[in-house]
Amino acid sequence: MWTKIIGVLGGLLLLAACSSAPETAPGGPPGGPGAGGPGGIGSRNALPGSQQDLEASAGDRVFFAFDRSDITPESQQILERQADWLRRYPNVTVTIEGHCDERGTREYNLALGERRAQAVKNVLVALGIPASRLSTISYGKERPAVVGSSEEAYAQNRRAVTTVN
């Protein structure tokens, strides 16, 4: 009798251990809810001036075309919201991280990531944010947001992310 009970409990434990986390919808918009866009997951209860607040209020990332570092009109709108957010919190400093997809050499992508981060910084400075509050770093292709070799993965990895220090 005890053997059967232990066997059933063991089977239930194995089934519970096999459950998976909910998946995000593939092919969703890179700037959609939960991806650092305004109104994303966690917009409630965000500590004012925190990374979570930046993500919920303004969005923390902009995306780039392949092998490009120019700011699109959509990215310009996000950066204007980031500048407004930074004006509300004048003691906050941020780091702008430049990222690339996996194509290209490590050296080339580090330089491209730096150009992307610098392009974002230049826009924020032009919008009145002191350069002393903004630092840049390039991670090239070393820190992908999405692992994969599809166009969707590439598009989400070509980005600049603003992080609160």
Task: Give the positions of each predicted feature.
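Bacterial N-terminal signal peptides that target proteins for export
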Residues: 1-8
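C-terminal motif of bacterial Sec signal peptides marking the signal peptidase cleavage site
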Residues: 14-17
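Periplasmic peptidoglycan-binding/tethering modules of Gram-negative envelope proteins
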Residues: 19-93
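Extracytoplasmic/secreted proteins, especially bacterial periplasmic and envelope-associated proteins
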Residues: 74-81, 107, 111, 115, ...
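A non-catalytic structural micro-motif
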Residues: 91-99, 114-145, 158-165
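Short beta-alpha junctions and helix-cap segments that line functional grooves
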Residues: 147-150
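A generic structural micro-feature
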Residues: 152-156
